[in-house]
């Protein structure tokens, strides 16, 4: 049987759902091909969305009218704004999610999406002619003719689960790996690498001694991810907190030779910033304990996810070390922890549109590009889906730049630097993080979504309303002001320079907020609370944004500057140990070469530039 679609998306995970929905919103007749319809939207690992850097990505996906933010709001059961006490530029919205509710909500929005059809099958082959995608071959000798394909295969490409010395070919527990597709990719000339990730054992919450634990509560005022979410409806839960002990560490040390990671059985490299418990014990042996968060997986589910205990040790060793952790002595293991290896493509094979250079019309998104995390996958999926629809219709492809979005930062990092380990997003990766905040994602990207034709009428109307309210509030505060003497009478300390300062200017002062200004100008009480928060943040950062842009420009001008052979990177203050090691190994000759080192940040590059200049001054004075 032969089907015909404009775009085919392979895989129904976080990248696949976003890619399929985005292509369909762009007007392409789209097929989402998945081995099992009931696993669309499954959270394979941790039951959480967002976090530092990751929460910004979710907001950006939502600003492009993507799905993840709305679905997380519908399924969230413990909302927390991380770094709440710090500045808005580094705050990260996060929620624990009910696995069942998340899957159900994602499947609902996929089924309701116009131009989108779900096909239950396995893709075995990619059809190409003259370097361009033409079709995909399915199980059962069917094929789908198409103009563009988006591969979002997650951990399924030749996936191999490791539990101790046991190996199980699978893409996820009890789900088969995809084997034919890897061979088809290699036949097309793609060189595949191996990466690895892991997951902890799942525990029965009814067998945990909760009275022995610390607790972490949800925020009292949960902040939704999506502009379209009015409020959070689900009850909010509490998570337990415990720690490993010296006995835990002893058992793990004694059994390292049985770990799939440390026995040499695993080829793939794992995510540095989500280490296994074996890695923690080996690399941080001086510590007497590591914190573990016990995260309930649902409102009516007894399963608990022990965040921080990812492992590939044998089941009997997992049982043994769990008994040494406070509160878990009698915990029943529902599913053992495991590591999983899978194939990936060097992302330097891609254009910034996420189309492969080798095969036109073929797009890649998610873990196949060497990233880790639901949020990173979803963000790539949106862009790949929009661009696949563009290729199918003969339109120009699009991509946010590093100055526009964390999505742009991530894609630029991937296609220019490649990966040596699974890539995850951090706020430190962005040069312009003061302007790439979670709270202004709509302002930055929804106009692009409207321009690209992927924003719904509901999204457009809500966005225009919010922007008009912010504009009105800005005008209202800029039209009211105080002289230094008037400010002093209201208890506001400013320089006695005779300059009149508007209410908007006063909001940039650390001790001034809109509530304090309402006492002076009661009419400011007409500004909605959400708008007040946006206005305060905008005013507070305005004075710093110009400086940030100037710093970035200075680094760009200096990219060709040579790095002296004798520079001691270990003596450069502020550099992380990770970067010091990579700099010693690579010995870059110029700042431009240093910039391409995986993990290099704009701030670190500026520190190296300062060290070079200081060395030049010392040599000049000698």
Curated annotation (Swiss-Prot):
Record GO terms (molecular function): flavin adenine dinucleotide binding
Recorded superkingdom: Bacteria
Keyword Transmembrane: no
SMART domains according to UniProt: GIDA_assoc_3
BP-aspect Gene Ontology terms: tRNA methylation; tRNA wobble uridine modification
Residues the record lists as binding NAD(+): 270-284
Location(s), subcellular: Cytoplasm
Protein name: tRNA uridine 5-carboxymethylaminomethyl modification enzyme MnmG
Origin species: Chelativorans sp. (strain BNC1)
